[in-house]
Amino acid sequence: MANNRAVRVGEQMKKELSDILIRDIKDPRVRFVTVTGVDVTGDLQQATAFITVLGDEEERKATLAGLEKAKGFIRTELGKRIRLRKTPELSFSFDESIQYGNRIESLLRDLNKNDSNE
């Protein structure tokens, strides 16, 4: 069973992280980013933020580089907004589930077209 506190902290971090990325990050590489989820370990020491980026592969890499550069600032801001003894160490990862879902949807659409043509 998942640690309820870790889940609650993850949801709060997702909300605050989204706000920080929209309002406080001035890096032009960090644009069109959506935070889709945050997984926090049970001991609240590490957190992985899952993001999606609108754009091609080059823009995704540039965005990830910008987020890695701003990681210290983001962690400091999270520490100010969320009352924890220690702010979790952040890492960023791309959320592939949306692309996977779109691919499945297009495959199903193609199957339906083929069935209707036959």
UniProtKB/Swiss-Prot annotation:
It comes from Shouchella clausii (strain KSM-K16). NCBIfam families: rbfA. Belongs to the RbfA family. Monomer. Binds 30S ribosomal subunits, but not 50S ribosomal subunits or 70S ribosomes. This is Ribosome-binding factor A. One of its GO terms (biological process) is maturation of SSU-rRNA. It is found in: Cytoplasm. Gene3D superfamilies: 3.30.300.20. GO terms for cellular component: cytosol. HAMAP family: RbfA (MF_00003). GO terms for molecular function: ribosomal small subunit binding. SUPFAM superfamilies: Ribosome-binding factor A, RbfA. The keyword Oxidoreductase does not apply. One of several proteins that assist in the late maturation steps of the functional core of the 30S ribosomal subunit. Associates with free 30S ribosomal subunits (but not with 30S subunits that are part of 70S ribosomes or polysomes). Required for efficient processing of 16S rRNA. May interact with the 5'-terminal helix region of 16S rRNA. The keyword NAD does not apply. InterPro entries: KH_dom-like_a/b (IPR015946), RbfA (IPR000238), RbfA_dom_sf (IPR023799), Ribosome-bd_factorA_CS (IPR020053). Keywords: Cytoplasm, Ribosome biogenesis. Pfam families: RBFA.
